[in-house]
Amino acid sequence: MPRVRRPAAPTGAATLLALMWLASPALPVGGFSYSEGLEPAVEAGLVSDEATAQAWLLDQLLLGLGRGELAVVAQAVAAWRRGDATRVRELNDWLLSTRESAELRLQTEQMGRSLGAWLQQRPGTDAAALARLLALPPAPSYPVAFALAAAGTPASLREVALAYAFGWAENMVQAAIKAVPLGQSAGQRMLGALVEAIPATVDAALVLRDGERMAFTPMLAVLSARHETQYSRLFRS
């Protein structure tokens, strides 16, 4: 697999804008339609106000993204940059294996495909690497697709992981505002709490080895499975 080329010298503003673009909720990948278990947590009475929503999201950041997903993003960026197709596939397989319900699996596959379709329209996208992404069986996961999109920038692995985590946080706060429901000011306070926790979470994820990554969130798995047959719902997960 050819390496994904990136500029030799970073251009700060361009790199920052590229990461902001990738983390933007306006990116056409459908992230707004998923709550990742938050909606069934509201239905079960586990989340009912700002305090419980904030605690839920912080736990999800620390116990979910921080222990596995963010590490995959960083490791996949490195793999794309050195042209290691075997490593990319291993990371994609591992990520998909951590999705313990049908709707969580559907979410990462749908968003991965959608990001791949967006990359097809972007000038300068490495065509060979994109073909490898879209050919990943059974589908590219969103973290691995995000990693390819970021691999062609001069951004460091830490900067890429920070952008990914912030994009996730912003989307989840918006989901909480709709599902609980909460006001915009409450949402900004929750986002502030997540932003404070993200740097240390990313730093911990960056040093994880393969055998240290994990995805042990049984409550989330149970709630997500229940959500698949929930009577009334706003979100797809």
UniProtKB/Swiss-Prot annotation:
Instruction: Show the Gene3D superfamilies listed in the entry.
Output: Urease accessory protein UreF
Location comes to: Cytoplasm
Keyword annotations: Chaperone, Cytoplasm, Nickel insertion
Q: Which GO terms describe its molecular function?
A: nickel cation binding
Q: HAMAP family, per this entry?
A: UreF
This chain's function reads: Required for maturation of urease via the functional incorporation of the urease nickel metallocenter.
Q: What is this protein called?
A: Urease accessory protein UreF
What is the organism of origin for this protein? Methylibium petroleiphilum (strain ATCC BAA-1232 / LMG 22953 / PM1)
* Designated gene of the protein: ureF
